[in-house]
UniProtKB/Swiss-Prot annotation:
The gene is gatA. It comes from Streptococcus uberis (strain ATCC BAA-854 / 0140J). This is Glutamyl-tRNA(Gln) amidotransferase subunit A. Belongs to the amidase family. GatA subfamily. Transmembrane segments: none annotated. Its EC number is 6.3.5.7. One of its GO terms (biological process) is translation. GO terms for molecular function: ATP binding; glutaminyl-tRNA synthase (glutamine-hydrolyzing) activity. Gene3D superfamilies: Amidase signature (AS) domain.
Length: 488
């Protein structure tokens, strides 16, 4: 029995009517995962016993008619702490780490009777754009197994796109939810910085990281954000926002909405076929009653350079805690304290992580701090001001999520600069702390294209409104890869 084609609302109806039990749904999800796992490699760990036991307890209590997420299984990126379930960040450094606490996002999900089904593969410590830097395996794109799934949340995206799970959580530091969502033809939201607690998220870039949901449809995405959003005393950067119902504007028309299309998002480095796809999407918004006008974000071209200084600097600080002393991997050949530190970090971290630690340490060093880290912070402010100017006159910004469709496995993983440039269109959103979503907008060369919608801070409801309006006029979200039972 496979239930992966049912929406969350449909599953809730089946659970309420007792046509299926939470345990049966969980078992069906585990079966869907196992049937596809050899082909795509989405998961690092399956929490089979724990998930089935939790489902039994939910069945015993009964499904809450007012809680659409009651009894729903979901997958979790492996840098989000789950008590009693391995949380490796896809690194040798944490290959055996089992947290003794849950991330706040997981606690919130458990409070709504959701079931963690397993932990998904990712780029090591979320550093990468293809899920190829994982210590454990390379995840494959759901549509074409010779292509990358994007990164760093590639496992979470592929798990949803291939029909293994209906929902998953990822994290987004420079595009790590939106880019894999685009590459796999699903919906991925990076909420406003501070909307979802970072407590229990293994830190990469603390001023940039944000947890967010993956889903098949816009409404399901908003339903999962409803669960995980909210302020948290355990996270000093958590925003004191009142949780709205993020589904409340879905279904409302967008007549009169003013949408901006930055010329920089369709310029150099963008595949001409993707440009054409996005211009068609813009026409669709106009048919729905919105106005779409060209604008400029002049400093966005510096986003990648700024990001790789700031994110790497923050990472070099955050990753100092992994030294072989308290938890995780420890080098066995070390004889002195210094050797424990040096050998553990040399052996425990992969090449990309070490590259970024060195880059960040250099940027923060006394002779270069002003020229690099301080200057990057100043340019970041200019990028933020560009967005503020546009949002003074417009409701939303649209553009491509990525400059190309999914690229081939083993094509860019030895070319760091080209890999970094794949985040050209997503990075500015993180630098400014804004919400951004990627939704399916068609296909180029048989591979999915993502349309990115960006709003001012705390405008997730508006983004979901526009995204759902676009989705309702297309069938891209209904088209599925062969592995999910589709024709493509």
């Amino acid at each position: 029995m496979s239930l992966n084609h049912k929406t969350i609302d449909e599953l809730h109806t089946l659970l309420l009517s007792k046509e299926i039990s939470a345990k049966e749904l969980t078992q069906a999800t585990l079966d869907d995962i196992k049937a596809r796992e050899d082909a795509v490699g989405s998961f690092i760990t399956l929490a089979e016993e724990k998930a089935l036991s939790q489902a039994e307890a939910i069945d015993a209590r009964g499904i809450d008619p007012n809680n659409v997420m009651s009894g729903i299984p979901f997958a979790v990126k492996d840098n989000i702490s789950t008590e009693g379930i391995l949380t490796t960040a896809a690194s040798k450094m944490l290959y055996n780490y089992e947290p003794i606490f849950n991330a706040t996002a997981i606690e919130k999900a458990y409070a709504k009777d959701m079931i963690v089904i397993g932990k998904t593969n990712m780029d090591e410590f979320a550093m990468g754009g293809s899920t190829e830097t994982s210590y454990f395996k390379k995840t494959k794109n759901a549509w074409d197994h010779s292509k990358v799934p994007g990164g760093s949340s590639g496992g979470s995206a592929t798990a949803v796109a291939s029909g293994q799970v209906r929902l998953s959580l990822g994290s987004d530091t420079g595009g790590s939810i939106r880019q894999p969502a685009a590459f796999n033809g699903i919906v991925g939201m990076k909420p406003t910085y501070g909307t979802v607690s970072r407590f229990g998220l293994i830190a990469f870039g603390s001023s940039l990281d944000q947890i967010g949901p993956f889903s098949q449809t816009v409404k399901e995405n908003a339903q999962l954000l409803n669960v995980i959003a909210g302020s948290d005393d355990k996270d000093s950067t958590s925003a004191p926002v009142q949780i709205a119902d993020y589904t409340s504007a879905i279904g409302k028309d967008i007549k009169g909405m003013k949408i901006a299309l930055p010329k920089e998002y369709l310029g150099e480095g963008i595949d001409p076929k993707i440009k054409e796809n996005i211009l068609e999407a813009a026409k669709q918004f106009e048919k729905l009653g919105a106005t779409v006008e060209e604008v400029s974000l002049p400093h966005s071209k510096y986003g990648v350079a700024v990001y790789y200084i700031i994110a790497s600097s923050e990472a070099s600080s955050n990753l100092q805690r992994f030294d072989g002393i308290r938890y995780g991997y420890r080098a066995q050949d070390a004889k002195t304290l210094e050797e424990i530190y040096v050998n553990t970090r040399s052996q425990g971290f992969g090449e990309e992580v070490k590259r970024r630690i060195m880059l960040g340490t250099f940027s923060l060093s006394s002779g270069y701090y002003d020229a690099y880290f301080k200057k990057a912070g100043q340019v970041r402010t200019l990028i933020i001001q560009d967005f503020e100017k546009v949002f003074a006159d417009y409701d939303l910004i649209i553009g491509p999520t990525a400059p190309t469709v999914a690229f081939g496995l083993d094509t860019l993983n030895h070319d760091p600069v080209s890999m970094y440039l794949a985040d050209l269109l997503t990075i500015p959103v993180n630098l400014a702390g804004l919400p951004g979503i990627s939704i399916p907008s068609g296909f180029v060369d048989g591979l999915p294209v993502g349309l990115q919608l960006i709003g001012p801070k705390y405008s997730e409801e508006r983004i979901y409104q526009a995204a759902a309006a676009f989705e309702a006029t297309t069938d891209y979200h209904k088209q599925q890869p062969v592995i999910f039972g589709g024709e493509k």
